[in-house]
């Protein structure tokens, strides 16, 4: 699913469902290899202020069915891989099997459930396996080797968190990220993507040069939408192209 890939995150229904589709397609056309679509949630413990703000705004006129509508509209125009990022509660409330089946039929390729540890994900993974949905699991810099190997077995790719804490833009990539990446690449057989704090072309260049198979950029895009609202399309195009230059 990923190989020297730029993965770009957007919040579903922010500022509207229609604009989310437009922003996703713009990023895909401008150099994003994978699109990550976030399901708004009222208690996003892994996310920093920028993405939290987008969730608060998106939830004002939100229903989960719109996530599937966004995915379907995107899939009609693009064959780029689509990863759905969600907390477990919205999935549980709809019903795990119903949610996964609907997501898959809408064109979503993989799901990342932020607050579902791999060792508690057996039933969820089983439903995904029956449906055809791929899984992505989060790994921290200090995830024990045995857990990392188990995640690797279950994941389409491993999403390595670059540092401790929450999502958000940072001035530089922590030395811890490079240490964690080297360790993960020595253990995992699946691709490893690095996220949390990646926001500049130089960050992308450094991480890809260090062996990352992909980089995830979220807060930088969401910040543009926070600032520009529905007028963010061309800024999204420019940022995607700039980040893409870091892969060369």
Swiss-Prot record:
One of its GO terms (molecular function) is tryptophan synthase activity. It catalyses: (1S,2R)-1-C-(indol-3-yl)glycerol 3-phosphate + L-serine = D-glyceraldehyde 3-phosphate + L-tryptophan + H2O. Pathway: Amino-acid biosynthesis; L-tryptophan biosynthesis; L-tryptophan from chorismate: step 5/5. InterPro entries: Aldolase_TIM (IPR013785), RibuloseP-bd_barrel (IPR011060), Trp_synthase_alpha_AS (IPR018204), Trp_synthase_suA (IPR002028). Its EC number is 4.2.1.20. GO terms for cellular component: cytosol. It comes from the Archaea. The keyword Transmembrane helix does not apply. It is an enzyme of class 4 (lyase). Keywords: Amino-acid biosynthesis, Aromatic amino acid biosynthesis, Lyase, Tryptophan biosynthesis. The active site is at 36 (proton acceptor), 47 (proton acceptor). Tetramer of two alpha and two beta chains. The alpha subunit is responsible for the aldol cleavage of indoleglycerol phosphate to indole and glyceraldehyde 3-phosphate. Belongs to the TrpA family. This is Tryptophan synthase alpha chain. It comes from Archaeoglobus fulgidus (strain ATCC 49558 / DSM 4304 / JCM 9628 / NBRC 100126 / VC-16).
């Amino acid at each position: 699913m990923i190989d020297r890939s730029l993965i770009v995150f957007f919040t579903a229904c922010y500022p509207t469902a229609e604009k989310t589709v437009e922003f996703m397609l713009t990023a895909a056309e401008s150099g994003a290899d994978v699109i990550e679509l976030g399901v708004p949630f009222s208690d996003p413990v892994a996310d920093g202020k920028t993405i939290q703000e987008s969730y608060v705004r998106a939830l004002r006129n939100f229903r989960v069915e719109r996530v599937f509508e966004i995915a379907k509209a995107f899939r009609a125009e693009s064959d780029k891989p689509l990863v759905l990022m969600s907390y477990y509660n919205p999935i549980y409330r709809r019903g795990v099997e119903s949610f996964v089946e609907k997501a898959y039929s809408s064109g979503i390729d993989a799901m990342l459930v932020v607050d579902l540890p791999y060792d508690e994900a057996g039933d969820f993974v089983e439903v995904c396996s029956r449906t055809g949905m791929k899984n992505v699991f989060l790994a921290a810099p200090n995830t024990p080797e045995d857990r990392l190997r188990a995640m690797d077995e279950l994941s389409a790719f491993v999403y390595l968190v670059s540092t401790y804490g929450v999502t958000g833009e940072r001035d530089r990539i922590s030395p811890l990220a490079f240490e964690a990446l080297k360790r993960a690449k020595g253990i995992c057989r699946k691709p490893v993507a690095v996220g949390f704090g990646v926001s500049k072309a130089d960050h992308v260049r450094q991480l890809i040069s260090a062996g990352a198979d992909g980089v995830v950029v979220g807060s930088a895009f969401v910040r543009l939408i926070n600032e520009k609202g529905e007028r963010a399309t061309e800024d999204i195009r420019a940022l995607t192209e700039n980040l893409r230059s870091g892969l060369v």
